[in-house]
């Protein structure tokens, strides 16, 4: 018996089509807030289970509405919002960020050109890690962490190195563990305060200890302070930039949590400290903004 090709010379062999896989750079990237756990929860919801989702800070679904003043301002400004803004974001909003921090005693001075607006803090985290990290650079990140920091570091070619926040010490960072994990490849340290997910609010003593380590090893400080106005039981928030005005510090914040508008994606990042030591980094930010 002859094969099909001999019987029908007009028939061509089946072409093997290209398969599109995810990029290799994603192999070490995980983001469980939107990964398998979230997918399992959605599947259980479809099966009729009532799932209480604690994975994302999303106050709107629990009936916490945005303040009326924000809603009114958005509606009033819609007719004037069709055009592109400057690459760093609209000037009135950046000016408002400067004014906000001028009201905080001890916060180092910065100006409107040091402020970047983003599609939430998440976009700004990715922008900063892309501008800062070369392949193999290490970033110290708290454990447990907000997983975007680990994912963004990996996606940018860096290596996340996790330092311990000890549950038996009220979830405070272990300064000893941080010191043990600094090496010649360490480029930055992430400080999430108030912390997500633990809720810990760090004392001045802890923050000064972290600043001392960053100062000794000339690390950039990446201060995630999105929950700075969500405080309980008399807790007081202290900014990293306040205790480390001599260090290059990127402070991240936004409207999402304090003003219950996470869906509006309104975040900012500003740089404080000796910016002359970060001119190339700033040029990278301006390129990506």
Q: How would you describe each model-predicted region?
A:
Residues 131-153:
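Conserved PLP-anchoring active-site segment centered on the Schiff-base-forming lysine
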Residues 47, 156, 216-217, 247:
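Helix C-cap/helix->beta junction micro-motif
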Residues 155-161:
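A short helix-loop-beta submotif of the ANL/AMP-binding
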Residues 161, 166-236:
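Active-site phosphate-binding strand-loop segment of PLP-dependent enzymes
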Residues 109-115, 135-138, 185, 246-249:
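Short acidic capping loops at alpha-helix termini that bridge into adjacent secondary structure
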């Amino acid at each position: 018996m002859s094969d099909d090709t001999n019987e029908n010379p007009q028939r061509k062999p089946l072409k093997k089509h290209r398969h599109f896989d995810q990029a290799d750079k994603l192999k070490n990237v995980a983001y469980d807030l939107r990964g398998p756990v979230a997918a399992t929860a959605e599947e259980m919801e479809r099966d009729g289970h009532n799932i209480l989702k604690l994975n994302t800070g999303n106050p709107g679904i629990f009936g916490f509405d945005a303040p009326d003043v924000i809603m009114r301002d958005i509606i009033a400004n819609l007719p004037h919002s069709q055009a592109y803004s400057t690459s760093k974001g609209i000037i009135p909003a950046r000016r408002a960020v400067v004014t906000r921090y001028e009201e905080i005693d001890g916060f180092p001075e910065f100006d409107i050109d040091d402020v970047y607006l983003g599609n939430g803090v998440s976009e700004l985290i990715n922008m900063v890690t892309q501008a800062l990290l070369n392949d193999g650079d290490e970033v110290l990140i708290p454990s447990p962490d907000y997983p975007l920091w680990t994912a963004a570091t990996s996606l940018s070619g860096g290596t996340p190195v996790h330092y311990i926040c000890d549950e038996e010490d009220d979830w405070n960072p272990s300064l000893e563990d941080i010191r043990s994990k600094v090496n010649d490849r360490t480029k930055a340290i992430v400080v999430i305060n108030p912390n997500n997910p633990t809720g810990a609010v760090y004392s001045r003593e802890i923050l000064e200890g972290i600043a001392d380590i960053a100062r000794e090893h000339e690390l950039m400080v990446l201060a995630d302070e999105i929950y700075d106005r969500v405080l309980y039981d008399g807790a007081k928030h202290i900014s990293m930039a306040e205790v480390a005005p001599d260090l290059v510090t990127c402070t991240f914040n936004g409207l999402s949590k304090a003003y219950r508008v996470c869906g509006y994606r309104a975040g900012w990042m500003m740089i404080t400290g000796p910016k002359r030591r970060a001119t190339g980094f700033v040029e990278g930010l301006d390129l990506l903004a």
